[in-house]
């Protein structure tokens, strides 16, 4: 516990918060180019082939981003938009690719939670 005199001499230092998505550089989204599109296996209790992409961002970082939804059209040199948000069972994946923007197509035949997957409204007869 500091004395009053010590507080006058040097004030208390504020805690600096560490960001969970440093590659975004305080922006909500960043554009990037896919350098590799592949599948990855999740951590211990889960089993799947999760679709991920290695992306070189305009901020100069190269990050691993998750491709949400069923099926995708991404390949090497595709231009994508990424947002923050980790995938709990994939170590090192701290970003999501935004579906339905730039070169990323929306999910086909999606009727619920469409806005999260860039799917257009289906034609109702």
Swiss-Prot record:
The keyword rRNA-binding applies. The modification 3-methylthioaspartic acid is found at residue 89. One of its GO terms (biological process) is translation. Coiled coil: none annotated. InterPro entries: NA-bd_OB-fold, Ribosomal_uS12, Ribosomal_uS12_bac. Keywords: Methylation, Ribonucleoprotein, Ribosomal protein, RNA-binding, rRNA-binding, tRNA-binding. HAMAP family: Ribosomal_uS12_B (MF_00403_B). With S4 and S5 plays an important role in translational accuracy. Belongs to the universal ribosomal protein uS12 family. This is Small ribosomal subunit protein uS12. It comes from Prochlorococcus marinus (strain MIT 9313). The lineage of its organism: Bacteria, Bacillati, Cyanobacteriota, Cyanophyceae, Synechococcales. The gene is rpsL.
